[in-house]
Amino acid sequence: MAKKKAFTPLFYLASIVFLPWWISFSVNKCLESWVTNWWNTGQSEIFLNNIQEKSLLEKFIELEELLFLDEMIKEYSETHLEEFGIGIHKETIQLIKIQNENRIHTILHFSTNIICFIILSGYSILGNEKLVILNSWAQEFLYNLSDTVKAFSILLLTDLCIGFHSPHGWELMIGSIYKDFGFVHNDQIISGLVSTFPVILDTIFKYWIFRYLNRLSPSLVVIYHSMND
């Protein structure tokens, strides 16, 4: 019975790690056909924001220029001009289909992530007792580490999150989140978030050192500053 109680939090931890993937996959598959059918039959207009409009227009202009260049190489004739018009028409339809699929992708992924967040929040609330046990284990593990190991771990974590090369990692992570939610890639927004998050984290971390570590373990702060210098 004691072993079973001891392993229960571990099973709960494993479920927290793997459950989001399973929920996301299942919800995505369940909603895919419904969202596709709803969008294709219930929407009479295509809604585009400024970024999507600009992207679609750029693709259309690029396509038109390529087809026009291809026709410039050939001899001019009525047949070629007709083929040029037909080619423009076909490729325009293809661009519209791609844009339609992108909109479905956005709605599907956004809905999936919202549902997953609600389910996992409820799962975490119901498993609050197990989370308390896991938290006590983590605190005990950290307490048993030496100050040198703690300082090294803090230094490694801060360098990864707010170090010199951290913007590249933030850019990849924020871009991945953008893609996961189905949003259109926006360099300006991503650059703004990349330049803001590390500064906020750095401020929070310095406050944490000043407010808590100096009181709990002054020797750890001394070792950390020595290693950081």
Swiss-Prot record:
Location(s), subcellular: Plastid, Chloroplast inner membrane
Q: Which residues cross the membrane?
A: 7-27, 107-127, 189-209
On whether Transcription is a keyword of this UniProt record, the answer is no
Which GO molecular-function terms appear in the entry? antiporter activity; proton transmembrane transporter activity
Catalyzes what? K(+)(in) + H(+)(out) = K(+)(out) + H(+)(in)
Look up the coiled coil feature and give its residue ranges: none
Q: How does it sit in the membrane?
A: Multi-pass membrane protein
Q: Name one Pfam family in it.
A: CemA
A biological process term (GO) from this entry: potassium ion transport
Which key words tag this protein in UniProt? Antiport, Chloroplast, Hydrogen ion transport, Ion transport, Membrane, Plastid, Plastid inner membrane, Potassium, Potassium transport, Transmembrane, Transmembrane helix, Transport
Record has Plastid as a keyword: yes
What are the annotated GO cellular component locations?
A: chloroplast inner membrane
Q: What happens when the gene is disrupted?
A: Enhanced induction of non-photochemical quenching (NPQ) leading to pale-green phenotype in developing leaves under continuous-light conditions.
Q: What does this protein do?
A: Contributes to K(+)/H(+) antiport activity by supporting proton efflux to control proton extrusion and homeostasis in chloroplasts in a light-dependent manner to modulate photosynthesis. Prevents excessive induction of non-photochemical quenching (NPQ) under continuous-light conditions. Indirectly promotes efficient inorganic carbon uptake into chloroplasts.
Question: What protein family is recorded?
Answer: Belongs to the CemA family.
Which PANTHER family does this one have?
Answer: CHLOROPLAST ENVELOPE MEMBRANE PROTEIN (PTHR33650:SF2), CHLOROPLAST ENVELOPE MEMBRANE PROTEIN-RELATED (PTHR33650)
What's the name of the protein? Potassium/proton antiporter CemA
Q: Which organism is it from?
A: Nicotiana tabacum (Common tobacco)
The gene from which this protein is expressed is cemA
